[in-house]
Amino acid sequence: MSRILLAPMEGLADDVLRGVLTAIGGYDWGICEFIRVSGSVLPVKTYERICPELLSGSRTAAGTPMRVQLLGSDPHFMADNARRLVTLNPAGIDLNFGCPAPTVNRHRGGAALLGEPELLHAIASAVRAVVPVDMPFTAKMRLGIDDTGLAVDCAQALAAGGIDELIVHGRTKRDGYRPPARWMWIERVRAAVAIPLIANGEVWTVEDFVRCQQETGCADIMLGR
């Protein structure tokens, strides 16, 4: 049984749009826009502002579970913020290693970290240590910064760090949102890790959905850009 998931889309998929899309039906769960973690533990109001679904059992009005995404590069502060987030009982916690925005990347966030598999492992391990085993813990990544040379290394580092599932957007940071998405590389990553993989990128139609499943070997698809 395949799942259809709603991607986090900064500047686009806010709580209003998430509510509209999930009201249509068909989404199994989604991820909110990222919450940036720097050198402090954020106040509860920050989490609730970016993901107001936390005030409603971490679900949209239609009942779709909404997970919370953290973005940052310091394992210590990522773990401290995850610890606070756990107290708000989110539907799950996701780590952002996929955002290609220059403003984010300049501050060592998102896809800019894909050249450092060891750091990805350190972040995932630190967060895993504070997230309950019964709370879904995932990460979302791209295929690399300028090329796909470290795609498998990054995926394996995150898997070894203890995430439950990995979402892979089939583009590099340099690719931005330009088509095509490299589905064949998602399949290579899937074959290299032992955890479930979710495919993301350039799925616009039912035909795209089926073809993406066939080319990646992934049953689950995340819809975004």
Annotate each language-model stretch with its function:
Residues 1-225:
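Flavin-dependent oxidoreductase catalytic cores
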